[in-house]
Amino acid sequence: TPIQPTPVIGMVGIINDCDKAVSSGWKKINDEIWIIGSYLSEITLGASSYLEYIHGQVTGRPPEINLENEKLCQEIIRNSINKEYIVSCHDVSDGGLSLALAECSILSGLGAQINIDDNLREDKLLFGEGGSRIIFSIDINQKEGWLKYLNEFNKKIKDNLYIYKIGSVSNNKLKIKNLKKVICDLKVSTLADKFNNGIIENFKK
């Protein structure tokens, strides 16, 4: 097997208060879902899981990492968690945005209504990968306080980070729209079945 073009770095850290740690799964219906990180124009399919598993190609240039933006992104998220504004959090990595959203739904059993308005090609929007991207959910009762906190970073965020509300937690479906067109509409139970039994089904072939 050739060496993959995407490096893998493992890191550990210290959580000062474990009671404030958040998991990846959505918490409750109507919580708002946000994304922070690289602009969509910086997202690429190069060296992505999509190219490898769907098209059988291990090729392309992986996205470049901006360490200053990564630091800022992590600072905002970690502080927002400590202040208890964020109730769930998940990185957008291999598989892109669609897989990250699916994993949050599978872990919680809750769905999501996602609305994005961008001219990016659909496969790139759903499966493109890039550094410094995190999806998270906020209790709507904490939104005002969180926006005030976020305002402290306005000058740093401008032109550096993409931060945008993309939807809300719903009942039992993951539904993704782009420019009002539905590009994904799946039951969470279907996603969970494929996720949990995919390896077994593959061996049966």
Question: Which residues fall in each region the model found?
Answer:
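Glycine-rich anion-binding loops of enzyme active sites
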Residues: 1-44, 165-168
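Glycine-/charge-enriched secondary-structure boundary and capping motifs
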Residues: 1-8, 59-62, 74, 79-205
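Gly-rich Lys/Arg/Thr-decorated short loops/hinges at beta-loop-alpha junctions or inter-strand turns
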Residues: 6, 46-64
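Glycine-/acidic-rich phosphate or pyrophosphate-binding loops and their flanking alpha/beta elements
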Residues: 17-29, 48-53, 72-80, 115, ...
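Glycine- and other small-residue-rich loops at beta-strand/loop junctions that grip anionic moieties
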Residues: 25, 66, 90
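Short glycine-/acidic-enriched loop or helix-start segments at secondary-structure transitions
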Residues: 44-45, 146
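C-terminal transmembrane module of polytopic alpha-helical membrane proteins
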Residues: 65-72
